[in-house]
Amino acid sequence: MPDSLRPLLRKPFGVLYTGIGSDAVKSLVKDLNNPTKLISVGDVTTFHLLDSNIIPDILIVDDRTKRAPASSQVVFGTKHKGFAEITVDNPPGVITEDLINVISDAIVSDKNVRIFVQGEEDLAALPAILMAPLNSVVLYGQPDEGVMLVRVTESLKAELKDLFDKILEKQDHKEQLLHNVRRKLNGY
């Protein structure tokens, strides 16, 4: 991803719950309010949710944190029985069509789904927010700060579609990818 887009991704799209590990999770629980879907992106965030008996509908992990291997405790802790397991390749700094397809399939599934990303899941929150039903919640970690809680609304989806297009325009095979992604985002 080009450096010019990085500041756009640093903008908070939700509410930051500060704290380390389970402290951040404990503070956000009161604001979950029965979401349509609960989606967790990131190993440490997911670990602390599961450790607090908060079970996401979808979790997206890559066995890494801050671009380094996650601890064995975190890796093991995100492998929760009862989840269908899907593995997808997604290189760092991009959003692949395969990742989008897997997230889309998980959102319409009636099963809990663990998406294991070989590569990097850092950008997975963006398509998750765009494809999730309204009133869903997407949680992702802000390293050394806490957990971001994003409630999915029409206005947020509209705002993020422009950013999403800018990211995809910088990738190879952009025309076909943009066409397929827009189709998915519109429910086809």
UniProtKB/Swiss-Prot annotation:
A GO molecular-function annotation: GTP binding
Keyword terms, alphabetized: Coenzyme A biosynthesis, GTP-binding, Kinase, Nucleotide-binding, Transferase
GO biological process: coenzyme A biosynthetic process
A Pfam short name: DUF359
InterPro entries: GTP-dep_dephospho-CoA_kin
HAMAP family: Dephospho_CoA_kinase_GTP_dep
Task of the protein: Catalyzes the GTP-dependent phosphorylation of the 3'-hydroxyl group of dephosphocoenzyme A to form coenzyme A (CoA).
Similarity comment text for this entry: Belongs to the GTP-dependent DPCK family.
The protein, known as: GTP-dependent dephospho-CoA kinase
Phylogenetic placement of the source organism: Archaea, Methanobacteriati, Methanobacteriota, Stenosarchaea group, Methanomicrobia
